[in-house]
Structures are given as structure tokens and as C-alpha cells.
Amino acid sequence: MSDNWVVQNLENALETWNEKLAEIWQLITTTPQDFKGGGIWGVIVNINGAVQSIGLALLVLFFVAGMVKTCGSFTEVKKPEHALKLFVRFAIAKGAITYGMELMLALFNIVQGTISTIMGSAGFSTPQQTVLPPELITSVEECGFFESIPLWAVTLIGGLFITVMSFILIMTVYGRFFKLYMYTALAPIPLSTFAGEPSQNVGKSFIKSYCAVCLEGAVIVLSCIIFSLFASSPPVVNPDAVAVTQVWSYIGELLFNMLVLVGSVKMSDRIIREMMGL
């Protein structure tokens, strides 16, 4: 690392960015069972088991409400075709509550397979590192004390923006994990709505929303891949310009690329919901 304070500040900011980007890459390929050693998942499984009793109680409620609304009289219920339809609906809803976690993990694993395919097709095992161009470092190191004063201001602003965006990026990915846990913990309640025909749309919306949360990972990976391709060809620095102009030009273009990535990751849920018509 250079001894120059301006260069050190920029390199530290970029190091934070690269660390968060690598952490995102690791988080996206991690399963909820393995996240943070699996301790959180153990608690979520216990909560899901406890909520299942509430889901089963609601199952009966939605089933009776649906039966009353769809059947005009008790005579219709006694018809074989109606009785069979009601029995199948009840059995499916009961199975969805009992084996809901297995269903959700199966959907998650399908999406994880898609994410792995995207990574393999793009040829990326880790995101591209963002580094300062050597010519920019040389120009900054050759500056005198008074020439370095405006560079300090530019560097402080640029380094602050890069650090803030790094944390916004990682918070979004952590937020996706929290949503996965919340969906899993409370799954029996919305899944119980499959017991009644009038209420089944709630269960369908829940499954669609859960799939959307899982697919957010694919959008995040695609965003990181596109940014890595941008980072592989860093902003062009004019060696004939003064150092402060070079640094300002480099930071400006770099921040723009980072803002595009942060915006894409932040809007990953919106992009998926638009794709799925939610």
C-alpha cells in the first residue's frame, strides 16, 4: 500500500467495497440452514412448528367457511363429487401446512440451482476486485503539499460515498435473508387458506411472494456480474490532466457504476415482482 494519505484513503474505501461485494457473493450461495452457523434456522424451525398448530386451527375455519360459501345447502355436500372435491382440498391444505417447510426449501433449492447456473455460465467464481489505476497513484504521489489539499476534500467525499454504498449493498442482501426467515416461520398461517376456495388466493399470493424473494438472489448475482465486467475495465484516466482532475474524474465514473449496482440490488424485489406480475 502507498504511503500517501490520499491514496491510502481511496484504497481503504475500495477495500471495504471489495470485502462487502465478496461477502454478498458468499451470502447469495449460502442456504438458510447454514447462515451464521445454523443457529437462526434452528429457532425458525421451532417457531414454524409452534405456528403449525395455529395453522391447523385456521385450516378448519377456512374449510368450513369455504364449504358454506361454495355449497348452497347440506344436500350438495352429500353429493359424491362435492364431497370428493372438499376432501381433496382439505387434504392438500393439510399437507401444505405439515410439509410447508419442505416445499419452501425445495423452491429455494431450485432458485439456488438457477443462481449456480448463472454463475457458471458467466464464468465467475468471485466478483472482480476494484483497484486504483497505477497511473492515478503515480500522479497523486507526485503532488506537493498545497496541490494535495483539494485532493483531500475530493478523496474524503469519494471515500465516504463508497463506504456508505458498501453498507447499503450488504444490508439489502441481509434483508433478503431476514425475509426468507420470516416467510418460513409464518408459513403455516397463509398456507392454511388453501382449505377454502374463497380464501385460496391468499395462499397463492404467499407462494408467489416467497418465490419472488428467492429469485431476488438471481437479480443480485446478475447485477454483481454486470458490475464486475464494468470493474474489469476501470475508468480511463487522462495522465496529462492535473491530479485533482484525474481523481475527480475517476471517482465520479466509479461512483456512477457503483450507484447503478446499488440501485439494481435495491430494486431486485421490484424487478422480480414486475416479472411475475405481483
Where are these regions (language model features)?
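Binding/recognition "hotspot" determinant
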Residues: 1-58
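Alpha-helical transmembrane segments and their helix-start/interface "positive-inside/aromatic belt" motifs
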Residues: 2-10, 80-100, 203-213
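Short amphipathic alpha-helical coupling elements at transmembrane boundaries
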Residues: 23-26, 82-89, 109, 116, ...
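Alpha-helical membrane-interface segments at transmembrane helix boundaries
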Residues: 44-52, 84-88, 92, 175, ...
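Hydrophobic alpha-helical transmembrane segments
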Residues: 53-65, 157, 161-163, 180
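Hydrophobic transmembrane alpha-helix segments characteristic of membrane transport
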Residues: 58-94, 186-200
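Non-cytosolic segments of integral membrane proteins
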Residues: 94-186, 224-277
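Alpha-helical transmembrane segments
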Residues: 191-208, 240, 271-275
